[in-house]
Amino acid sequence: VTAWPIRLHAACDELVWAARLNLAWIVFTLAGGAVLGIGPATVAAYTLARRHARGESLPLWREFAAVYRREFARGSLLVLPLVAAAGVLYGNHRYFAALGQGAEPLRLATLAGLIALAAVTAYLLPMYVHYDLKPLACLPRASRLVLARPASTVLLLFVLAAVVSAAGILPFLALALAAGAWIQLNTWLCLRFFAENEAHLHPKGV
């Protein structure tokens, strides 16, 4: 009986954390003029999400600002190409959808490209903050994980789709919670996937 209040309290704490992380991500993205801010803000959010998932208690705003400054150049190098690729694919998808049935194969191709990009990105960002890797070194490793762990990849895409759908139904969530919730869930899941992968590659006693 006493477990339910504890679980409810923990769930509320996680929602509050996700909302605070979401707000910090928005504020620091805008502080960089959106284009220059989204890279370091995203890396900072994933860095703090990793530390939170590992049980650390930390001053969010001060630590966010510190990582944001430290990762300003590398964060942009990591994130901006992903944002640009997503923008091009989404724009082409909408364009081909507007052309009707004649462009259906091209529409499906761009949709497949968007799904593949989402899958790679879902591994790439948590990987960058978890391992000591250069931005360009993350892409091939994340791509291999997409193929090597199909069940994990499907789960990540399902969670992403659920967050996006919830934000679409309740637009307030998109502003107040969606990005922070996805970043925290994405990081939490990937830390477990990385641990499983390492255990498989380096079994104990071998």
Predicted features, each with a name:
Residues 1-106, 110, 117-206:
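Helix-coil boundary and N-terminal low-complexity module in membrane systems
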